[in-house]
Design a protein with these regions (language model features):
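N-proximal low-complexity "stem/linker" segments adjacent to membrane-targeting elements
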Residues: 1-16
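Catalytic core and acceptor-binding pocket of nucleotide-sugar-dependent glycosyltransferases
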Residues: 93-98, 110-233
Length: 233
């Protein structure tokens, strides 16, 4: 385990992935933040914290970003370590010590996965949200500021990752949260200033989940990259 790091597993979890988390990280600091109706009767380690919350009143029609924000903030509220890594309950990653080590090297930048990290300029402030690692305070800032944006203003596109990426920078740079286009011309510089990418294929074996018109797609090795994906800045 890493004493000053907590894994926050958020959202609905799937049995295969959660069993892998239990098998590989039973002695780590872990918070599982899920929903009241998610119950697979698994034997969770006694040192883990399990939070089952009521669903929030929906506040954003955008790929369940409101559920991600709520479950993540619920989980972060139970964290007592300096650093956290937010992951999804329908995914699994091995070797998270590598993420932690790189995060320390690039701090105060936030370290995110390479999954769906869009090329600079393709979409404003589009990071990846499949895992996010930084100080616990930084993660709280990111998700709380995104909550403020979506409950008090309007979404500026249909990408949850853009709102998370922009909101954190807004908080750090003291920008106007409700006018992303005012900062469009500094997108590339600010992404490089505040974020870095971890190439996910270093974390095999893994399970990565993606939605598609035909249903969920799962990747278990050699996650590829196309014209809409990058793995380094």
């Amino acid at each position: 385990m890493i004493e000053d790091l907590t894994i926050v597993i958020q959202g609905r979890y799937e049995e295969e992935q959660m069993k892998l988390w239990i098998e590989n990280y039973s002695d780590w600091n872990v918070v599982v933040s899920t929903w009241i109706d998610c119950d697979l009767n698994l034997d969770f380690p006694k040192n883990w914290k399990i939070i089952k919350s009521e669903y929030p009143k929906r506040f954003a029609d955008m790929q369940n970003i409101d559920l991600q924000i709520s479950s993540t903030l619920n989980g972060l509220s139970e964290v007592n370590t300096k650093y956290s890594i937010k992951v999804r309950g329908d995914e699994f990653f091995s070797n998270l010590h590598l993420v932690y080590e790189k995060m320390l090297q690039i701090h105060p930048k936030v370290l995110v996965s390479s999954i769906f990290f869009r090329p600079l300029g393709l979409y404003l402030y589009h990071i990846s949200d499949h895992f996010i690692c930084s100080t616990t305070d930084n993660l709280k800032i990111m998700f709380q500021t995104t909550y403020d944006l979506l409950t008090k203003g309007d979404k500026f596109n249909n990408s949850p990752e853009s709102h998370l990426g922009f909101s954190f920078i807004c908080a750090k740079e003291n920008w106007n949260l409700y006018d992303v286009y005012q900062y469009a011309d500094v997108n590339d510089n600010m992404i490089k200033k505040w974020y870095d990418i971890f190439e996910v294929n270093q974390l095999q074996p893994y399970i990565i989940s993606e939605s598609s018109p035909e249903g969920r797609i799962y990747y278990r090795d050699n996650y590829g990259y196309g014209s809409h994906h990058i793995y380094e800045l």
